[in-house]
């Protein structure tokens, strides 16, 4: 088995507002190997997005720890985790965020370690693969929500991160453009790991494995073919 790149041990996440205690995650222990395309699926409130945010260091768990190789999150400060995210992670959030005063290309090149002709050529390649080649010099105000999301996908890849974390990356896209994004993320496993949260099993048919979540607990890894088959025409999985 490939050595684990990212792992969790007994992760829990509890919200207590004084009136109610909510267990968002309960004792989640998983391993994600290097250079894999994996999905996290579950119904609303299952904890899948919370787990993604903890894996990426954007949220601290109530208990347990996350490790990236030998790097334990618990032993490091919030500033350390900011540096970790900048140096080793790429992000695609459900709601696209772009700097409104910069063109789509300028937003993508922000993710490049060196701004040179090679970086621009690389960015142009991503734009073409994502079907937004004609949008490179447009401002975000001139783009649709789906076009903005595809720009964010290109930006996430520009610095060749070890891991790309994507939270519902196809939610604002039609079927065809959703597949463009998924195909590009799937191909990225040649360079690094991709972790995708989605409600649509069809978007994970090319994944290496899918983690099913319910009520804040891990139900274990599944073969994407089995998950897609269980979903049927409704595109929902009974958990």
Language-model regions, residue ranges each:
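Helix-to-loop junction immediately C-terminal to a conserved catalytic motif
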Residues: 56
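Conserved ABC ATPase "signature" region
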Residues: 72, 117-135
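Conserved ABC ATPase signature
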Residues: 139-143, 147
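Catalytic Walker B motif of ABC-type/P-loop ATPase nucleotide-binding domains
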Residues: 164-167
């Amino acid at each position: 088995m490939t050595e684990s790149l990212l792992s969790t041990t007994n992760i829990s996440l509890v919200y207590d507002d004084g009136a109610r205690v909510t267990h968002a995650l309960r004792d989640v222990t998983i391993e994600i190997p290097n250079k894999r395309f994996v999905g996290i699926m579950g119904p609303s409130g299952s904890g899948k997005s919370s787990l993604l945010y903890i894996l990426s260091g954007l949220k601290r768990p109530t208990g347990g720890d996350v490790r990236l190789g030998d790097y334990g999150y618990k032993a490091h400060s919030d500033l350390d985790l900011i540096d970790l995210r900048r140096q080793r992670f790429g992000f695609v959030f459900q709601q696209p965020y772009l700097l409104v005063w910069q063109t789509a290309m300028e937003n993508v090149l922000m993710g490049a370690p060196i701004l040179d002709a090679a970086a621009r050529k690389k960015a142009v390649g991503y734009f073409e693969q994502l079907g937004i080649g004609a949008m490179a010099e447009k401002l975000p105000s001139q783009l649709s929500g789906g076009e903005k999301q595809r720009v964010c996908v290109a930006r996430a890849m520009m610095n060749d991160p070890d891991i790309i974390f994507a939270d519902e990356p196809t939610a604002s896209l039609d079927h065809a453009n959703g597949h463009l994004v998924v195909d590009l993320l799937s191909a990225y496993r040649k360079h690094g790991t991709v972790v995708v949260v989605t409600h649509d099993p069809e978007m994970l048919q090319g994944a290496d494995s899918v983690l099913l979540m319910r009520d804040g607990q891990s139900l274990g890894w599944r073969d994407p073919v089995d998950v897609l088959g269980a979903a049927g025409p409704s595109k929902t999985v009974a958990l």
